[in-house]
């Protein structure tokens, strides 16, 4: 799960670079949306990875 969180975080950073710097000005709106989407997914995966890890180590 933590690996997926890292992957989605990297995707969010790449989307931010394209969206916020104006490199792809035609796709800036889409890139900003993807940044928010993948950032939220990365945070969810991070939380799930941490909670799943604590459940496994408690037993």
Curated annotation (Swiss-Prot):
InterPro entries: DUF1328. Signal peptide: none annotated. The chain crosses the membrane at residues 4-24, 33-53. Its main location: membrane. GO terms for cellular component: plasma membrane. It is a multi-pass membrane protein. It is found in: Cell membrane. Pfam families: DUF1328. Keywords: Cell membrane, Membrane, Transmembrane, Transmembrane helix. The keyword Magnesium does not apply. Belongs to the UPF0391 family. HAMAP family: UPF0391 (MF_01361). This is UPF0391 membrane protein Geob_0344. It comes from Geotalea daltonii (strain DSM 22248 / JCM 15807 / FRC-32) (Geobacter daltonii).
């Amino acid at each position: 799960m933590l690996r997926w969180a890292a992957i989605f975080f990297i995707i969010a950073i790449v989307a931010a670079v394209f969206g916020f710097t104006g490199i792809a000005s035609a796709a800036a709106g889409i890139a900003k949306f993807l940044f928010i989407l993948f950032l939220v997914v990365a945070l969810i995966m991070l939380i799930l990875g941490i909670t799943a890890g604590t459940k496994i180590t408690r037993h």
